[in-house]
Swiss-Prot record:
Transmembrane segments: 31-50, 340-362
PANTHER family noted in UniProt: P2X PURINOCEPTOR, P2X PURINOCEPTOR 5
Name of protein: P2X purinoceptor 5
Reaction catalysed by this enzyme: Na(+)(in) = Na(+)(out); Ca(2+)(in) = Ca(2+)(out); chloride(in) = chloride(out)
Gene name, Swiss-Prot/TrEMBL: P2rx5
Amino acid sequence: MGQAAWKGFVLSLFDYKTAKFVVAKSKKVGLLYRVLQLTILLYLLIWVFLIKKSYQDIDTSLQSAVVTKVKGVAYTNTTMLGERLWDVADFVIPSQGENVFFVVTNLIVTPNQRQGICAEREGIPDGECSEDTDCHAGESVVAGHGLKTGRCLRVGNSTRGTCEIFAWCPVETKSMPTDPLLKDAEGFTIFIKNFIRFPKFNFSKANVLETGNKHFLKTCHFSSTNLYCPIFRLGSIVRWAGADFQDIALKGGVIGIHIEWDCDLDKAASHCNPHYYFNRLDNKHTQSISSGYNFRFARYYRDPHGVEFRDLMKAYGIRFDVIVNGKAGKFSIIPTVINIGSGLALMGAGAFFCDLVLIYLIRKSEFYRDKKFEKVRGQKEEDNVEVEANEMEQELPEDKPLERVHQDEQALELAQSGRKQNSNCQVLFEPARSGLQENAFVNMKPSQILQTVKT
């Protein structure tokens, strides 16, 4: 028995099992299935492969370097500064040319400051006082300019004044001018040189045209047809970012310069081109008290006596952030097979949906359900039925088969209950039989026929 079991197991390893298909002649379900197949196929071809290019291996670990250079000059003539010519060393910070740089467009200058004793500026709450006890000596003025000396300085007969402080005097008191100091900054140019590399594919490129013409960068400007001349006019960048130059030059702001690289390496390297986008990154709402961008810096000097003094400058301007992003794709068999397999799985989901419609939703669903699902008894149940049938046959007389006994019993019962009615007698003819014999049973469908005869 054990050897037979093992033999059957070993032989079963070489069996091939296949599905049994039922062809349903339903035009509605068939049409639905073809529509689903066509939809999935179009999704796979158009969206997955043509648009998303999911047959490619993608590299998003972009390595990038940015070098910037600003050029231009501006002339001013003010009461405080007199006639002055401004060049890149005056208005570009930092001068190294990094991916974040600042261009000064407006200034508030407080010249000739020296360390000493003076009054705090009005309008600073912690620096206001009514008497000397309001100014604690040695304390710094919150959001102010120096350390309190302990004295309250009042002008004339006023009851309110400001604390005396030790600071760089005189303190900054001027307000913002109504017009930007460097109006001509709109015509400055910015040269943005970008080098990128995708390490997975060992692919490198720059946004500057490879040419031997030394005068190319001196004569060209960026345009939609000249992508490899990354020289931008400052006013154009601000306009492309959706801002007004005179407004942003007065109070300052932050502009984002985005460089996008989307490279299909299945094509030639000439098809891998940079794309530029510009937007304003800071809070540009006019009602906000924190709008704009500014900071302070100083230039220090010494007088003939060796005493240090400085010119304090509060600079307003535009900060530019150069942000580089990108990805590269190249054909790979692995993502291709994965996406084809996903499409085939969607095909199977479509067939499953059509099965649900066929066996549950349409008018003849019960008929198709009976054809699709076949009930088969297990081997043990078949053996039990066969044993019971054999036992019943052995209990009957040999000359009376099982179906004949059933007929005799029915005829006897009807004869005992029969009676005459109006000199007529109901005679029960032998019932008609139909059916097939399965497992020693006969499926009987008796059809009793009553016939009236005269006596």
